Amino acid sequence: MTVDIKTTLVTIPNQNLQIAGYLAEPVAVGQYPVVIVIQEIFGVNSHIRDVTERVAKEGYVAIAPAIYQRQAPGFEEGYTPEGIEAGRKLKDQTSSAEILSDLEATIAYAQTLPNVKPEEVGLIGFCFGGWIVYLGASLPTVKATASFYGAGIPHWAPGTAEPPITYTDKIQGTLYAFFGLEDTSIPMADTEQIEQALTKYQVNHKIFRYPGADHGFFCDQRASYNAEAAADAWQKVKQLFQTELK
């Protein structure tokens, strides 16, 4: 059973930067855990807004910050070759330090909201956002992370930064990672490396690999959408947040 929600555009301060955010929250008065929703390379588009609303309907305050605020304020693209090209260019202009800073600022903003339980923080991200939330899972405030098909976690970072896998020893919460076995951007060796690192550092985790599913399988606006895999993954996300965020 889902709850009634309301949505609004918000501004998240981070020093001199004003980050645009999409906020979805239950209408009923109360206190709720918060889940930060992290975009793909395409910005906070209609799919990410929809996911933010779906999370809120499960009884969470959900916020999607604009990760490209520094590079391209208001950037939003669809799933076209042009959108992919534009999104990838912006991804390469980011920095891990700035991303972490903006994520921390979003969490800090959420913790000031009167209907948020400040100790109950979760993350969910897709595509580039899956990469970002693995990095973000290293923040001490984060209790639960759902990372969807984040390419490059073991070996890629913008500029000269270390890849997210090098932060695994700092992860204190529970992490679920979701991959499609048909996703050529994430070789099986990468997912095995992620699993080995999580096991080595005794991170509470589960890795889910979906046969027949490709990159972007959770997004119903993509040609690669896989309804069966998406439905199963959503149930696991709900289970994760229900268990870890009280």
Swiss-Prot record:
Pfam entry (one): DLH
Per UniProt, the keywords (alphabetical) are: Hydrolase
Keyword Nucleotidyltransferase found: no
So what EC number does this one have? Answer: 3.1.1.45
Q: Where are the transmembrane segments?
A: none
Query: Which InterPro entries does the UniProt entry name for this protein?
Result: AB_hydrolase_fold, Dienelactn_hydro, Dienelactone_hydrolase-like
The catalytic site is made up of C127, D183, H215
Give yes or no: UniProt keyword Nucleotide-binding: no
Q: Which Gene3D superfamilies match?
A: alpha/beta hydrolase
* Broad enzyme group: hydrolase
Q: Which domain of life is it from?
A: Bacteria
Tell me what reaction this enzyme catalyses.
2-(5-oxo-2,5-dihydrofuran-2-ylidene)acetate + H2O = 4-oxohex-2-enedioate + H(+)
Q: Provide the GO MF annotations for this entry.
A: carboxymethylenebutenolidase activity
Q: Which family does it belong to?
A: Belongs to the dienelactone hydrolase family.
Q: What's the protein called, per UniProt?
A: Putative carboxymethylenebutenolidase
| Species assigned in the record | Synechocystis sp. (strain ATCC 27184 / PCC 6803 / Kazusa)
The major lineage groups are: Bacteria, Bacillati, Cyanobacteriota, Cyanophyceae, Synechococcales
